[in-house]
């Protein structure tokens, strides 16, 4: 039987508050400045310095603006760092709008196919409700970007630059999702009436293509690649295709890269491969697949890759214990327990199980600091522009990484034979709403 909150209890709560006058100082500061500013720990800011024993040379940060394309920016940033070093470019970027266009069109097709597949289920079934919650969005996972690149390649930012809607995606997402839900109504009715759903879907996608062209521009089939390197030498290649550009200039075999996750919940054993039902963007594309490993294994692989001069795509819960102004992510950055007098002591597994934490954002690890043989902090390249953090870069303490990092993508050469074999086994399929199916925004 549930019990209501009584006035007697409220009086008791108020009395306990008045018995602690020292908290009036905290109250005044918090009410004027907010929780984070009032509880910021200066010791943490001093100890987390942006200096690293091992660091990959990078250029200025990119800016995803008001969009949820961090996973795309992070992956393309790992590619451009390699390309910039090889070709001697400065502040060169690959087109995030190009991959965004194909991602949205493919997600539309993926959604409509899933609507047709589930057309016999009730509208209020958990699966259909989950599909309709977000027909498509900006967010994604590493394997989704792999699917796009393998099918469409990449282009320089100059070949397909940003538009208003690529950087401020809310209106486009609203309109596209409204259209997709309308199409879902039509397709489900057509299925019930035994009409041609495939033909209807093709007509729908043709109109969605037009919507995307009008808001993002039409992707180039060929383009001219012309640039000056850091030595001011002019280089030129005419009429190259996006796939040829990737193979010739980026030249990374993405099949050699393995997504590692750290999900220490009871239902996910370590050294086991996982996938997520109904998660993806391209029908018959690269499936979402991870290998769940202990955090020490994940961090060692990332450290080794950085030491060898290659950056690392990683996914985390960026909003947890993170200070944007200085770009510090540390478990001690805010004195919350000391200020409020109670502890929030959930484990990483409990935060996943009880919906308090999950992968929300993707960035790039570009440096690591080793002191006395132990890693104590990491350099992080964000994609929020140069006005956030330290010219766009953040520093994460190793303790923060333990608690709030959920995924890295590393070359398989940094993993043992046993781990590679574990990844290659048949994955366990997770439900679509599992926290490890969350998308980086």
From Swiss-Prot:
Matching PROSITE patterns: THIOL_PROTEASE_CYS, THIOL_PROTEASE_HIS
Reactions this protein catalyses: Inactivates bleomycin B2 (a cytotoxic glycometallopeptide) by hydrolysis of a carboxyamide bond of beta-aminoalanine, but also shows general aminopeptidase activity. The specificity varies somewhat with source, but amino acid arylamides of Met, Leu and Ala are preferred
Gene3D superfamilies (alphabetical): Cysteine proteinases (3.90.70.10)
InterPro entries: Papain-like_cys_pep_sf, Pept_cys_AS, Pept_his_AS, Peptidase_C1B
Name the record gives this protein: Aminopeptidase C
One GO cellular component term noted in the UniProt record for this chain: cytoplasm
E.C. numbers: 3.4.22.40
Catalytic residues, chain numbering: 70, 361, 382
A Pfam family this chain is assigned to: Peptidase_C1_2
Class in the EC hierarchy, top level: hydrolase
